Regions:
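Short, conserved beta-strand edge motifs with alternating hydrophobic and charged residues
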Residues: 10-13, 60-61, 97
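Short, basic/glycine-rich phosphate-binding loops at helix/coil junctions
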Residues: 22, 61-63
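N-terminal active-site beta-alpha-beta segment that forms phosphate/nucleotide-binding
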Residues: 1-54
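Short phosphate-engaging motifs
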Residues: 19, 78-79
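Alpha-helical protein-protein interaction elements
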Residues: 15, 70-71
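Surface-exposed, charge/polar-rich loops and edge strands
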Residues: 48-58, 65-70, 80-129
Length: 129
């Protein structure tokens, strides 16, 4: 695994009331504290917080992805806001993660702030855009 090879793995951290994501290091041994509120009860991790532009590779969840590499997210805007903040900085490799059934052969709706992904990985393999 990436962890066994010495890679540092970061997980998204959502600050209450904020749209841009922070990323915190994953540590298998660290205790995780659940959010005190929120219907999703997303685990929150403690430690160093960094922004997306400091990452080498960013794996993005998606609802759909089109043939040009534009993703359709879940509508929260967290990844869009985080990626928009990297436009004028060194950007991480942006890789969409999903299933083959989420690929769309046409063009998905997009807005001016949407950014094209560098690739997509699913159970059938990898595609670079």
């Amino acid at each position: 695994t990436a962890l066994q090879r010495g890679a540092r793995v970061y997980l998204p951290y959502i600050e209450p009331g904020r749209l841009r994501l922070w990323f915190t290091p994953y540590c298998a041994d660290a205790a995780q504290a659940e959010r005190a509120h929120g219907r999703l009860k997303i685990p929150q991790f403690h430690g160093e917080k960094i922004r997306a532009h400091r990452l080498n590779t960013l794996l993005l969840p998606l609802v759909g992805i089109d043939s040009e590499g534009y993703r359709l997210g879940q509508g929260g805007g967290y990844y869009d806001a985080s990626l928009a903040a990297t436009r004028h900085r060194l950007q991480p490799h942006k890789i969409g993660v999903g299933f083959a059934c989420q690929r769309h052969n046409g063009r998905l709706p997009r807005e001016a702030h949407d950014m094209r992904l560098d690739g997509f990985v699913c159970e059938h393999g990898w595609r670079r855009f």
